């Protein structure tokens, strides 16, 4: 199988999600969208907020939750920290907020940076739950599908980073249960080790995210590249669902049986990756940058990041 192709396109999802914010910025000043304060917010403002949670700290420079530094609350920053600083790919010279713990893979429940990632993901999920619960939101199936995709992406990150997080799909005052409690294999009368509960949570979230993405994909926009002059620029389309499904299947060995070497879903990972590769999207390579930029020594990576 051409699994090397899969690796080549995964960085595109981060770029896509970052670009997704461009068309939503003007819609954030739409009044209060906190479900505990305003049960019927401006629909477009809340829809935009679901996208904004992928890249922004908050609407006005402050974070969406209590934190000493709003910049530490952003999703992209925290995803980078835990994906890269925990390896030999990157190192951070400062030590506040538990950054050093990430570098040494010694994070504890009290590690500040770990809590910031969890708070951000749960905040994003709450905004999506609020939007999806509104009767007025049901009228536009495409926007509804996009928010389902965004929520599924946040839960995918919960699955990937935490395994057995709290799980909730609605706006409620009830204390949410952890994901393992929703696995049909879970028996409340039985005794489990923490590792067993973790695996039950992973299995449940894997199947839930997969189903959500499959259902959302049907109503999402066609997989077509857009420019900033197009009305749908920055909106998640079918290709976003495909690449996330590919990523989900790629790690299914760990999510389903805690064995990264025994993955029954390699073919599905390849199938969805090739759907993106064979779509009208293309890698941003040397043929797509201005001649002047090439003459000055710029590479595609430099212009993107």
Put a short name on every predicted segment.
Residues 1-32:
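Bacterial Sec-dependent N-terminal signal peptides
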Residues 24-77, 287-293:
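Membrane-proximal, proline-rich intrinsically disordered regions
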Residues 44, 48, 57, 91-165, ...:
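Conserved, well-structured interaction surfaces
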Residues 159-161, 166, 251-260:
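Short coil/turn linking the two alpha-helices of tandem helical-hairpin repeats
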Residues 171, 181-199, 243, 254-271:
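Acidic, serine/threonine/proline-rich low-complexity intrinsically disordered regions
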Residues 253-254, 270-305:
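Polar, glycine-rich mid-to-C-terminal structural blocks
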